[in-house]
Amino acid sequence: MNGQHSSPGTPVQRPSAGPVNQAQFSQQRTNQLTSLLHTMTMYQQLAQNVGLNTPQGQVYLLQAQTIRRQLQGHAQSGQLPNQQLLQQLQSNGALQQGTPEPSNTRPRPQLNAQEQTMLLVRHRQLQTAQNYLTEMKEALGRIKNELSTNERLDTSAREALVKQESELTVKIAQFTAAISNGIRSIQQLQNRQASSANGNNTGTSTPVNASTDTRKSTASTPQLQQTQAQANAPQQRINPETSSVPETPVGVSAANVSNESTELATSATQQSGLANNVEKSQTPSYMSANHLPKVDSKSPIPFSVPPSRATLTGGYASGSIGLSTPGLSRAPHYELDNGNRLLSKRKLHDLLQQIDSEEKIEPEVEELLLEIADEFVESVTNFACRLAKHRKSDTLDVRDVQLHLERNWNIRLPGFASDDIVKSARKTGPTPSYQQKQNAIGTAKSLNKD
């Protein structure tokens, strides 16, 4: 363009950006290493504030040691870009840049990606457990203060507080034991790493042993992982960050510098996030999970329903018996409009239709008839029960109901007539002599008329 043409194969001169990019990567790496160094110093200060022998102080020291190992790897490789960083590492007890170690001193083992991930996960678990332990201790103190100072508590409220106090005491003991086991397992992991490093220097061990020790250390703290199962779930939803921080030595080329910068940025972000989450309070899961009602679900019990009518397929509609659905008998309609009455409104309307289909019944009369039916059945039942009790019987018989209906209401049950009523209603037939006399009287009357 602009009058300048380039033939095919002619090299085009472009400005070189190599030194500028190298300087930018170097500055970025310096900032990231400085951030890691400040994070390590902050963890050391926090450990001194809470106490080096306390469980929380041990957690802070372990986190500071993890960051220090990363910086030591860069110092031993001679890739620290700033002399000031080297002096700060030396003041914190780190190795000097480019200084060879004596042969009689034991080198500190370098952590691979798997071991570093494991340590970070353990640190998070210990930190979360320590936060929940602090919250539970505060809640226990409030409950004890309420029980000792508030004299207006009723019996149910006091029993509920005492129950919560006992539950918190048990959980505090469990969390304390889990934290102690977690710290002990991390220390054992570090000791095994040191011994495996010595074995590798003397040629008596292989990387397989290191991985075996890692698996053993992973299985040494099941109690801590079970205790923190509910604690890690909300933390992972709030802070979805990767726990794996691979350690890659700093190279000379621009690609290696870019990879190193990305990994250091991830590590610095993770360590800063852990430091910021130290004093954040979260709602413990035991405050809601343990008070939820337990639902016992029962498996359904299979049952067979006989077919409603005889069919050629044995109760199945059509087709194959194994592929079709059996015909089920329909349940009778359940009426809800009776209002706990013995006689339903539907039956009353049916009776009215049988007597006269054109007549209507008013709601007040309908309620009155339903009440009369209920009172009638109740009175008959009570009187029949008294008769059965008078007979010294525990079972109500038909004759008890029958006697009350016949004597008091003049109602005879069809098919259930008593013996005395049958005798009174029985008619005697005339004798032959009486029939002859009646015939003679009839004949005489007819003759007199003629």
Swiss-Prot record:
Cited CDD domains: HFD_TAF12
Cellular component annotations (GO), alphabetically ordered: nucleus; SAGA complex; transcription factor TFIID complex
Domain of life: Eukaryota
Domain spans labelled Histone-fold: 338-413
GO BP term, example: RNA polymerase II preinitiation complex assembly
Keyword Phosphoprotein: yes
Biased composition (Polar residues): 1-10, 19-29, 190-212, 237-246, 255-281, 430-441
Main location: nucleus
Region annotated Disordered, chain positions: 1-29, 190-281, 426-450
KW Transcription (keyword) present: yes
Keyword annotations from UniProtKB, A to Z: Nucleus, Phosphoprotein, Transcription, Transcription regulation
Any one GO molecular function term: TBP-class protein binding
Function according to Swiss-Prot or TrEMBL: Functions as a component of both the DNA-binding general transcription initiation factor complex TFIID and the transcription coactivator SAGA complex. Binding of TFIID to a promoter (with or without TATA element) is the initial step in pre-initiation complex (PIC) formation.
Family in the record: Belongs to the TAF12 family.
Name of this protein: SAGA complex/transcription factor TFIID complex subunit Taf12
Organism listed in the record: Schizosaccharomyces pombe (strain 972 / ATCC 24843) (Fission yeast)
